[in-house]
Amino acid sequence: MHVKKGDKVQVITGKDKGKQGVILVAFPKQNRVIVEGVNIVKKHSKPSQLNPQGGIITKEAPIHVSNVMILDPKTGEPTRVGFKVEDGKKVRIAKKSGELLDK
């Protein structure tokens, strides 16, 4: 997967197109990510030990990783991700600026 937890991304397609946020959780096996403030759904929950009140909870749902693009750290624009080997380690780079994405 070209994105990781903590990456700043922009949604490029779907109902939340144009929104930006940080990846909270990545699910590599399903190729899905949860982005902060994107794809908000309402979940109806029964009263339980943790939530004695129950009711309707709003939370982020996963979206497919192909619907997000990482933001270039230099320009702040959406960019594709490239890979390069530096000192025997595989690192991610932004295609637009050539900037390193991995610290």
Swiss-Prot record:
Gene3D superfamilies: 2.30.30.30. Keywords: Ribonucleoprotein, Ribosomal protein, RNA-binding, rRNA-binding. CDD domains: KOW_RPL26 (cd06089). Coiled coil: none annotated. InterPro entries: KOW (IPR005824), Rib_uL2_dom2 (IPR014722), Ribosomal_uL24 (IPR003256), Ribosomal_uL24_CS (IPR005825), Ribosomal_uL24_KOW (IPR041988), Translation_prot_SH3-like_sf (IPR008991). Pfam families: KOW (PF00467), ribosomal_L24 (PF17136). One of its GO terms (molecular function) is structural constituent of ribosome. GO terms for biological process: translation. It comes from the Bacteria. GO terms for cellular component: ribonucleoprotein complex; ribosome. Belongs to the universal ribosomal protein uL24 family. Part of the 50S ribosomal subunit. HAMAP family: Ribosomal_uL24_B (MF_01326_B). One of two assembly initiator proteins, it binds directly to the 5'-end of the 23S rRNA, where it nucleates assembly of the 50S subunit. This is Large ribosomal subunit protein uL24. It comes from Bacillus anthracis.
